[in-house]
């Protein structure tokens, strides 16, 4: 099943986990520590109380990362990636409804794939643009760069885990996300060393 189909079929929990996982993997671009999104993950694991806490947690994270409208891009791949990451956080819905979460999960999915494409030297050389992101999300994955392929696999796995196991799948989803965040942090660090 393609990523687009998985998002279309996901329930509120799956959509929230999918969007949050994409955002969490991109935390290195936001300047936050690895635990900054923990309260949002915790609110997903709780039932009705979590729904009430979600909006408050979103606002707290935004305040910690100083996001209003997001930073201006610098024209570099890193600058564009930072803008996309801030847009994901800025688009996080304060109200956890299926419609809000579906839109956010979709935005986060596209942005995360674009970020990984921007930061992957192979993908840049291949000019992996918006049409390629759409192709990837719809299941056309030939000639995909390794970094983008890994991000696509993680997005699909998170949605499948939560669909199959409900709240019990959140722990594994978070573990996958932590792995992806480490990979992106290493890529960002390597690119920074290359510029120095």
What are these regions (language model features)?
Residues 15-16, 33, 78, 94, ...:
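Alpha-helix N-cap/helix-initiation sites
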Residues 56-69, 76-89, 105-106, 112:
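Internal, conserved structured core segments that host functional sites
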Residues 1-76:
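N-terminal domain-start signal
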Residues 82-196:
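An internal, amphipathic alpha-helical element
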């Amino acid at each position: 099943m393609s990523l687009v189909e998985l998002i279309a079929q996901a329930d509120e929990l799956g959509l929230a986990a999918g969007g949050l996982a994409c955002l969490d993997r991109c935390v290195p671009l936001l300047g936050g520590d690895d635990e900054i999104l923990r309260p949002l993950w915790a609110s997903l694991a709780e039932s009705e109380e979590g729904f009430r806490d979600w909006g408050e947690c979103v606002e707290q994270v935004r305040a910690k990362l100083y996001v209003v409208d997001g930073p201006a891009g610098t024209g570099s791949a890193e600058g564009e990636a930072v803008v996309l990451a801030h847009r994901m956080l800025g688009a996080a819905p304060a109200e956890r409804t299926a419609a809000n979460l579906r839109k956010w999960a979709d935005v986060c999915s596209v942005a995360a794939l674009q970020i990984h494409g921007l930061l992957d030297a192979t993908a840049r050389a291949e000019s992996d643009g918006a049409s390629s992101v759409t192709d990837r999300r719809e299941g056309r994955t030939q000639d995909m760069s390794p970094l983008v392929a890994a991000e696509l696999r993680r997005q699909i796995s998170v949605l499948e885990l939560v669909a199959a196991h409900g709240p019990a799948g959140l722990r594994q989803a978070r573990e996958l996300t932590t792995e992806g965040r480490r990979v992106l942090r290493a890529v960002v660090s390597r690119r920074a060393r290359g510029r120095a």
